[in-house]
Amino acid sequence: MKNVFFVLLVAFSVFRCAVRPESKNTPAFQVSFPAEVGGQPQDGRLILLLSTNNKQEPRFQYNFGVDTQLGFGMDVDGMKPGQEIMVGDSAFGFPIRKISDIPPGEYYVQAIINRYETFKLKSGKTVKLPPDQGEGQHWNTKPGNFYSRPFKITIDSVMTEPIRVVMDQVIPPVKEPTDTKYVKHIKIQSKMLTEFWGQPTYLGAHVLLPEGFDSHPKSKYPLMIYHGHFPSDFGGFSTEPPPANMDTSDYSERFGIYGYNKIQAQEAYNFYKQWTSKNFPRFLVVEIQHANPYYDDSYAVNSQNIGPYGDAIMYELLPEIERQFRGIGEGWARFTYGGSTGGWEALAVQMFYPDDFNGCFAACPDPIDFRSLCLVDIYKDKNAFWYDSEFKKLPRPSHRNYLGQIQATMEENNHYELVLGTKTRSGEQWDIWEAVYSPQGDDGYPKRIFNKETGEIDRSVANYWKENYDLRYILQRDWKSLGPKLQGKLHIYCGDMDNYYLNNAVYQMEAFLKTTKNPFYGGEVDYGDRAEHCWNGDHVNPNYLSRLRYNTMYLPKILKRIQESAPKGADIKSWRY
C-alpha cells in the first residue's frame, strides 16, 4: 500500500510540473547618472517612461488622457553618481500599475529625475521640493534635470537581464525675455517669501506699456492684472504680422481646426494695432510670474504651504510696478481678470483685497464652491474617486468633451499625479489645490484632502478648506462686511459644458449671489451654451478666438466702472489721450 501511494505521489508531482505555466520574467530597469552631469548625490523623483512610438520623446507623451503612454515613478534620496537604481514593481505606475504588467512588445524607453532641493521653512519644518528654474514648474522641461535619450527595447517573457538606462543629458537653462518698446520685465526679491522659504525668493512680472508712455511723462495709468498660468513672456502681442505664406497645416486637436498657429499670430498683431490706435484707452497690463516649488502659479493668495504670495504680490510687487511704470496706485484704478486658474485668482484677490481692486472678471474659474470640487462634494462625499453606493462601484469622471464623452476619471487623474510625485509634489492640478488650500502637516508637507491612492476624503482637511478658501462659502459667511465693498465688482463666466465640470460650482455661486441683500451684489454671471473650457463671456466669437482677447474684451465694462465709481478729484483724463 505504501509503494502504491508513493508511485501515485510521484505521478501527481510530474503531472503538476507538466501543466505548470512557464514563469514570466518581470522586466526591470536599472537607472543611473554619470558624474559628468552631476557630481553630488541627488534627491528627487525618478520617472521611467515608455512609449510605443517615437513621434515625440516619451517625457512629452505622458498625461492623464486617453492618448497617454506609460510612466512609473519612485522617490530617490542620496542617489550617487554611477549608482544603479532598480526600477521594478515597487515603482508606482499609471496607466499600468506595475512594471510586471507591461504587455510584451517594442517600446521606446526614457528616464528623468525631477531634482529636489532642501528647504528649511519658517515653520521650522524641513522639506524636499523641486524648485522652479524659470520654466514654470514642469518636470519634463525643468533646467538642471537629468534625463536619458530615448532608445528602443523589446519586452518579452524571456528577459533575463535588467535594461540599463543612463541619464547623461541635462536640460539647459531658460533664456530670459528681453525688454522691448512696449513690453518690460521686472523681478524683485520678496522679503516675505524669502523669510517663508528660508532662501532668496523672487517675484516677476511682464508689463505691457500703453502707447505714448514716453511722450506723456506726466500721465499715470490704471492697471489691469491678467491672471493665469506661468507666462514665460508677455503673450498674444506682436508688432509684426504673420507671414502671408505661413504654414497652416498644423492641426489643433482641442479646437478641431487647421492653421491655429497663424490665427494666434494674427490675433497678436491685431491686438498691437488696437492697443496703439487713436483714442484707445491707455492702461498698464500685468502678467505675474509666481511659480513656486509646488506649481507654475501660487494662486495669488496666502497659504500655509506655499507662503504669503497674496500679500507679497499686493504689497511688494504691485507697488514697485506702479512706481516704475507710473500706475495710479489706487484701488479704483485696478482691475483683474483671467481664465481657469486665473479666473479663480481674479475672484479670490478681489474678495481677499476688496478695497484694492475695482472689479474682477473671472472666466471658467477653478472650483469656487467646494461642494462642487469638479464632481466631488468634499463635505458630504466619502470618496473622491467613487460615487457613494452600497453595491455599485461607479467612478467619478474628471474630464469630458462638449458632448459629455468621458476622457479621464478622478482616480486616473490622481494616479497620474502620483507617478510624478508623492507628498503633493507632482506639480499638477489636484496637488496644487492641496498645496494652496490645505494646512501644513506634521512632516512639513500639505495635508492630503483625500488619500491619493484610494480617494478616501479627510473631513478635517475639508473643513479647513471651507473656512479659508471656499469662495462661495466665505462670501456667504462674510457678506455683511464684504458685500458693500464688492457691489458691482463681481463678473463670472463659464461654459455649461466645461471640460472639468467647473460650471457646477458657478451654478452654486450664482444661486447664492441672487439672494444677496444689503446690498445686492450687482454683478454678472453668464454661461456659454455647449461651450467648453475656457469660455469667457463672448457670445459672438468661437472659443478659440475669444480666449485670445482677454486684454481688450472687458475694457468697455472697466471704463464704465471707472466712470461710475472713481472718487471725486480722481485722475480719469491724463491717460485718455
Language model regions located:
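N-terminal processing/targeting junctions
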Residues: 12-15, 28, 214-216, 315
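Non-catalytic cap/lid and distal C-terminal segments of serine-dependent acyl enzymes
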Residues: 52-92, 97-577
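Contiguous beta-strand segments within globular domains
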Residues: 24-33, 39-47, 200-206, 225
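Bacterial Sec-dependent N-terminal signal peptides
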Residues: 1-27
